[in-house]
Amino acid sequence: MTMTDPLGDMLTRIRNGAARRKASVVTPASKLRARVLDVLQAEGYIRGYSEIDHGNGKAEITIELKYYEGASVIREIGRVSKPGRRVYVSVKSIPQVANGLGITILSTPKGVMADHQAREQNVGGEVLCSVF
């Protein structure tokens, strides 16, 4: 069966894994998912991730979730731009999450990046998700 929203599926797996206090979660691999995970790792929301290629054209990503004093570092994670309704913003209208305590991840012409990087590089794009 085909997946309508692969990025949304990955975010749901992370949310569910964190709710169940899992050490790691597994998701099918893609370039977009890996770029979003790069941002999450750089911002300190996950410990890391590793790609596993099974050789039959199906690769998986194992995401190591991060906890602080028994609670997940990720309190909320959600998709903003969805396949049925894309959300694009200019650099002036990039949303802040929790008054700057969280991040918004954007897909820009310069690559996938966090909101503060997009503001520094003066570039807008598609709002993929928000994390707090």
Curated annotation (Swiss-Prot):
Top-rank lineage group of the source organism: Bacteria
Keywords: Ribonucleoprotein, Ribosomal protein, RNA-binding, rRNA-binding
SUPFAM superfamilies the record matches: Ribosomal protein S8
Transit peptide keyword on record: no
One MF annotation (Gene Ontology) recorded for this entry: rRNA binding
Alphabetical GO biological process terms: translation
HAMAP family, per the entry: Ribosomal_uS8_B
Protein name: Small ribosomal subunit protein uS8
The species this protein was found in: Allorhizobium ampelinum (strain ATCC BAA-846 / DSM 112012 / S4)
